């Protein structure tokens, strides 16, 4: 396709930064939470593998998946670094989505790993339907609650009491401007997937409002701004707005 070359360059970059352990991380670019980068890298490679079954791609994927499986902690989740320490729901969801994409691409993912991770996510749900950051208590918030719904969907849970409560919670966050929502782009990256899977009235209410808010905030040069980085913001907005096209396997109903 027209974007084959840049996608292959991105694949080459990730393969070059895959360590022997399977950990995908570029030391010079690593943040304080490199397991985020690892999870999203595995997700990206898994999506590419279905269209470009390069042998070295499968090898990196297999090692990346093994690292995720091997570093799951006793609670069933993951944290910022590839070690069995504590866990939080945000990093955990990132790994769950990577494992789901890898499984969809034909790689083996132990059922026990998925079951334990989903149990962790469920245990993080608050009475208001939203999700706390870590086990032990804490308030609900938009971004991590949207992420939690997507993780539950990935395990085949679509119409359960947990999902219904969570969707009701997310509906209260509808189309709030970026300035009033921490992690706005990250939250909407997951929220659009949650609402797309919910379909029906939930999707009919959510997407037009978010689409209109996002198109209004687009800058004249086609980009979006964010406190983190304009490239990141633009990529996230583009992903959100194209979900109804049903192109990427991980987003498909």
Regions found by a protein language model. Name each.
Residues 1-6, 19-66, 70-115, 123-209, ...:
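An alpha-helical repeat/solenoid feature that recognizes helix-turn-helix modules
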Residues 11-18:
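Eukaryotic helix-linker segments that join adjacent hydrophobic helices
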Residues 215-219:
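Predominantly the C-terminal beta-signal and adjacent terminal strand-loop region
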């Amino acid at each position: 396709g027209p974007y084959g070359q840049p996608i292959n360059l991105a694949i080459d970059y990730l393969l070059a930064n895959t360590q022997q352990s399977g950990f995908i991380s570029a030391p010079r670019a690593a943040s304080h939470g490199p397991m985020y980068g690892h999870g999203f890298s595995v997700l990206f490679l898994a999506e590419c593998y279905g269209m470009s079954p390069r042998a070295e791609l499968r090898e990196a994927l297999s090692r990346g998946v093994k690292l995720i499986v091997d570093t799951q902690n006793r609670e069933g989740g993951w944290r910022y670094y590839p070690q069995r320490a504590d866990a939080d729901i945000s990093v955990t969801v990132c790994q769950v989505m990577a494992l789901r994409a890898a499984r969809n691409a034909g790689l083996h993912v132990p059922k026990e790993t998925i079951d334990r991770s989903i149990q962790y996510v469920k245990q993080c749900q608050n009475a208001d339907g939203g999700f706390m950051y870590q086990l032990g208590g804490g308030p609900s918030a938009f971004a991590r609650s949207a992420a939690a719904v997507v993780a539950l969907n990935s395990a085949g849970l679509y119409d359960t009491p947990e999902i219904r409560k969570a969707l009701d919670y997310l509906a209260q966050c509808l189309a709030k401007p970026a300035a009033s929502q921490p992690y706005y782009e990250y939250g909407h990256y997951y929220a659009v997937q949650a609402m797309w899977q919910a379909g029906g009235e939930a999707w009919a209410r959510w997407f037009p409002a978010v689409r209109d808010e996002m198109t209004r905030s687009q800058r004249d040069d086609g980009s979006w701004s964010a406190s983190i980085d304009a490239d990141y913001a633009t990529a996230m907005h583009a992903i959100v707005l194209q979900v109804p096209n049903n192109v990427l396997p991980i987003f498909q109903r």
